[in-house]
C-alpha cells in the first residue's frame, strides 16, 4: 500500500479507461462501507454507555468496560482506514488522469477538491498505525470517554469523522470525475 506522503512517486502509467474503473471501484467501496462505519459508531456509543453506567454505579468492572471502549474504537478506526484508503486510491487515479493529454480538466478538479482530499489522506496516514491512533484518542479524552460518543475523533491535531458531509463530498468528487470522462 502506498504511503500517503510519497504517494505519487513511480506510479506506472495507466490508460484512462482503467483509471475510471479504479475511481468507480473505490468510490463504490467507500460508499458501500459507510453503513459498516455507522454500525461501528453505534457499537462504540454502546460501549461508552456501558462504561458510563460502570462509573455511575461505581462498578468494579470499569477497567473491563474501558477495554471494551478501546476495542470498539479500534474497530471503528479500522473501518475508517478502509474508507480513507478508498479516497487515497481515487486521488492516485485522479493524479494519473492529470498527466494524460487534455488532463488539465482533471488537474482543476483535483485542485477544487484538494482540501477535502488532503484532510482524508492526513487521517489515512494516521490510521496506518491504528493502535497509536486509539491510544492518542484515549489520551485526548483525558479519562472522559463519554466524549467518544460525540462522533468527533482526534487525529494528529485535527478533529475528523466519516459522516454524511464526507460522503456527500465523495459523491461530488465522483460525479465531477465521471462527468469529465470524455475529456481524455
Regions found by a protein language model. Name each.
Residues 1-116, 146-184:
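Amphipathic alpha-helical interface segments
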Residues 135-147:
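Short linear, low-complexity motifs centered on an aromatic residue
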Residues 114-138:
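Histidine-centered, metal-coordinating catalytic motifs and their short helical/loop contexts
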Amino acid at each position: 500500500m502506498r504511503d500517503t506522503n510519497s504517494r505519487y512517486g513511480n506510479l506506472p502509467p495507466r490508460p484512462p479507461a482503467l483509471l475510471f474503473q479504479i475511481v468507480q471501484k473505490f468510490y463504490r467501496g467507500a460508499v458501500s462501507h459507510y453503513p459498516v462505519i455507522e454500525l461501528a459508531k453505534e457499537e462504540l456509543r454502546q460501549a461508552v454507555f456501558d462504561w458510563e453506567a460502570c462509573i455511575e454505579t461505581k462498578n468494579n468492572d470499569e477497567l473491563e468496560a474501558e477495554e471494551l471502549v478501546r476495542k470498539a474504537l479500534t474497530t471503528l478506526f479500522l473501518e475508517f482506514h478502509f474508507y480513507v484508503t478508498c479516497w487515497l486510491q481515487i486521488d492516485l487515479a485522479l493524479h494519473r488522469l492529470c498527466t494524460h493529454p487534455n488532463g488539465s480538466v482533471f488537474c482543476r478538479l483535483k485542485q477544487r477538491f484538494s482540501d477535502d482530499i488532503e484532510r482524508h489522506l492526513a487521517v489515512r496516514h494516521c490510521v496506518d498505525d491504528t493502535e497509536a491512533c486509539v491510544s492518542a484518542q484515549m489520551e485526548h479524552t483525558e479519562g472522559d470517554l463519554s466524549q467518544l460518543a460525540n462522533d468527533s475523533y482526534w487525529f494528529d491535531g485535527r478533529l475528523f469523522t466519516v459522516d454524511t458531509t464526507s460522503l456527500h463530498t465523495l459523491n461530488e468528487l465522483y460525479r465531477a470525475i465521471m462527468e469529465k470522462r470524455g475529456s481524455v
